[in-house]
Amino acid sequence: MPIDYAELHCLSCFSFLRGASQPAELVQRAAELGYRALALTDACSVAGAVRAHQAAKETDLHLIHGSEIRIHQGPLLVLLAPCRRAWAELCALISLGRSQARKGDYRLEREQLEGTLPHCLALWVPDDAPHDAEQGRWFARHFGDRGHVAVALHHGPDDEARLQRLLALADRFRLPAVAAGGVLMHRRGRRALQDTLSALRHRRTLAAMGTALECSGERHLRSLHSLARLYPPALLRRSVHLADQCRFSLDKLRYEYPAELVPAGETPASYLRRLTLEGARRHWPQGMPDKVAHQVDHELALIAEMGYEPFFLTVHDVVAFARRRGILCQGRGSSANSAVCFCLGITAVDPARQSLLFERFISKERGEPPDIDVDFEHERREEVIQYIYRKYGRHRAALAATVIRYRPRSALRDAGRALGLDAATIDRLAGSIQWWDGKRVDPERLREAGLNPDDPRLARTVAIAGQLLGLPRHLSQHVGGFVISEGPISELVPTENAAMAGRTIIQWDKDDLEALGLLKVDVLALGMLSCIRRAFDLLAGFRGRRLTLADVPAEDPAVYRMISDADTMGVFQIESRAQMAMLPRLRPQTFYDLVIEVAIVRPGPIQGDMVHPYLRRREGLEPVDYPSEAVRGVLARTLGVPIFQEQVMQLAVVAAGFTPGEADALRRAMAAWKRKGGLGPFRDKLLKGMRRNGYCEDYAERLFRQIQGFGEYGFPESHAASFALLVYVSAWLKCHEPALFTCALLNSQPMGFYAPAQLLRDAERHGVEIRPVDVRHSDWDCSPEHRGDGEPALRLGLRLVRGLNRRAADRLIAARGRRPFRDVQEMARRAALHRRDLETLAHAGALRGLAGHRRAAWWQVLGAEAGLPVFEDLHIEEAAPALDAPAEGEDLVADYTSLGFTLGRHPLALLRPQLRRRRLLTAADLASTGHGRLVRTAGLVINRQRPGSAGGVTFLTLEDETGQINLVVWKATAEAQRRTLLAARLLMVSGIWERKGAVTHLVAGRLEDWSDWLGALDVRSRDFH
């Protein structure tokens, strides 16, 4: 007689630090073993449900959705959702439990289950506790004929006695008994990993766990024959009978967007059309261009057909709120392909000036929801988030989750803790690897860290860390993806508290939402928008000139000259090493050149061998040819080279006969082929289609190779155009208002590639007068001050003083506003400043105007005490002793410690005599050095970068008193001198100086760490992946 079984109690790794297998692994294994069904029942969670759902679609396995719930001081239950209403009940219960506990935990009382789960099926998992009788009575009374007793047998010595006890309990309370394995892993081989997770959950070492570990390795998916030897046939049959009652699938979820934004008497479609046309009239008072009018009609018809009008209205409402509050915002990504989004004010890409491909945004054939990403000022985005919560209520709006997974360092740290390694060893072990090392731990790296790779405990740590890699550790919040629903969101998906106060998240991430076709609004943060808005405000205040993104003077030759000279420190998107190297070669002269510049310095075009052909054609070194007029129509604006995702899609349509939906499927496959494969069928279809349309084999193959390159991350043109606008605006501000732009940049930190030290030196090179932090003049923010010639000087703000309390600064500014300070004592009394605040200001040199040099300021601080308001008019004169001023080096160290920069001489200017004796060249010397020369130089390391697309090459920027030096370190050199490369603050480099046109760099040979020369100087680099 065939054996049939459904596993009804199974935890995946989304029961964090309990389950040791991915949902897909459990589904695939259950299907391999011939199970009828599998219930994924993670602890108070459905975070892994969508992944299991997708995996089950690839098999014949019937997937059941449920959750394990431990009642506070009560029984352990497994709740199953047989229908859509039961799913809503389960999600609401999980949401309630999560809302009543700290992040990562849950709490539910018995009475909270009573009457709330009328459609759920339930399994009671007895604990072998003296409370079984009382718990059984409650369970039977509450669940009645929907309740069952779960029987879990794991080849223990008392299995027979346990079976009889559980059957007796079932009989006593007239509940059917059913086999259920309490599964924690898909195969027995995960036992060591599961033990490690248990130790981490209990915050103990494995050695100290004792009986807290599972008593056997049997909590895995077992063969049907193994189960048949353990369980009475009736219990196995009942598992199938119960599974057959559960017909709910996530495919049955239907999502409704809020409709309350639609005025009475209108439909969502009519209201969206009205708003779109009103926006069009603002942009084109003389009437929409025919091309745009046709595009708008086409988009509105498709939006109506897909039922997406409420989604567009919601995004419009959020953007309109931001604009009413003066919060700068701009849509980006594929939504910038939409003329409707432009008319609604969501995006800034003018459809009359750009070539849009709406199918990149919405495709009927794809049948998936559109994705609208809107960037807001990073420091004011919270206002937008809280507006959404107020507008729709927390019961209808929540942020998507992000799954935080184990990466190499965190895996090594947790594995080391579980195995009882001491903290110092764990630090050395984790510090021995970098992100680019991947999963492998090189024994040589361990030796460099002073560890013995042959130590058995260390080897075991590395092995367990390898198993931890990729497992989810916990849920965090998405950067800004909001799900907003017509009804309670907790009936669609459970919600829980985020770590950040005032935030609620759902238990699914963006990939889960996309898989189920659920819409989200991306409310993202962008530091450059904060900077630009601040710069606009400063411009209005200083010059009385009010600008917006739309009316910054366009196509300014001076701006393009500055960009072509790679004078772009601080400019959005084009301040990186790679962009600065490209700018003198591409030499942008128009806005569309900026669109190309943004897109071309990306892994996609680089890997697809598109960059050099484009540059050669732009320079006239290579002819531009098109195999057909149709291809010319797609590629003429990029000189015959496909640079944007939309171009690849259009080529597939015009050259290979793809439908727009098939072209979008190709685009999606491009993005995932390295992870999932799947480009093979598209290759065949593309090559056959192009041959059929008369294109030669070589051209078709070349196009396919370029498409593969886009799998390394190619930009949509619409996204590049959105970013190019911010590139131009920030470049215009830098070109024409360098003081105000630098001021705005400093007030928007942290952001960008460069620290304030580099931004300030760059501003000085542009003729900006920098005035120091001074308690007599500085506000919290940096601010412009009038010079004699009508131009602004830049006064540094108190925000730059490390460790200064904002409330103390506000008190100081308020007291100064009433009348100026006479000395430090009076300031301390009137502003109620504490000794620590005064010491911080003295160390930063901010008391120089009241007390003189740092030592004199320190002396006055020692005699100052914070006062009460009643004494603020009291002034006591006390003579200060004559103290020698600090040496220049002492001031330099204090500047860097308290501010991170100096307005005095650069540190290397002080070291230059010693460096000259060693024949080390400056950045200025190198600027006039010929190509191919062997040179030696040294500089402060200000940033390190190792892009994933660079084949292991590391890029560094060094700085001395005369400028910056771009350093290229090939992979072999980097590995051979790894410690020096990563640790040096002052780096000496010997290598080959390379020059090609205006692009220069030093290819490193030998590296030496000269950081000892800096002593206590606190110099920090900004390091990037």
UniProtKB/Swiss-Prot annotation:
Keywords: Cytoplasm, DNA damage, DNA repair, DNA replication, DNA-directed DNA polymerase, Nucleotidyltransferase, Transferase. It is found in: Cytoplasm. Its EC number is 2.7.7.7. The keyword Nucleotidyltransferase applies. InterPro entries: DNA_pol3_alpha_NTPase_dom, DNA_pol3_finger, DnaE2, DnaE2/DnaE/PolC, DNAPol_HHH, NA-bd_OB_tRNA, PHP_dom, Pol/His_phosphatase_N. Signal peptide: none annotated. GO terms for biological process: DNA repair; DNA replication. SUPFAM superfamilies: PHP domain-like (SSF89550). Coiled coil: none annotated. Disulfide bonds: none annotated. It catalyses: DNA(n) + a 2'-deoxyribonucleoside 5'-triphosphate = DNA(n+1) + diphosphate. It is an enzyme of class 2 (transferase). GO terms for cellular component: cytoplasm. GO terms for molecular function: 3'-5' exonuclease activity; DNA-directed DNA polymerase activity; nucleic acid binding. NCBIfam families: polc (TIGR00594), PRK05672.1 (NF004225). DNA polymerase involved in damage-induced mutagenesis and translesion synthesis (TLS). It is not the major replicative DNA polymerase. Belongs to the DNA polymerase type-C family. DnaE2 subfamily. This is Error-prone DNA polymerase. It comes from Alkalilimnicola ehrlichii (strain ATCC BAA-1101 / DSM 17681 / MLHE-1). The lineage of its organism: Bacteria, Pseudomonadati, Pseudomonadota, Gammaproteobacteria, Chromatiales. The gene is dnaE2.
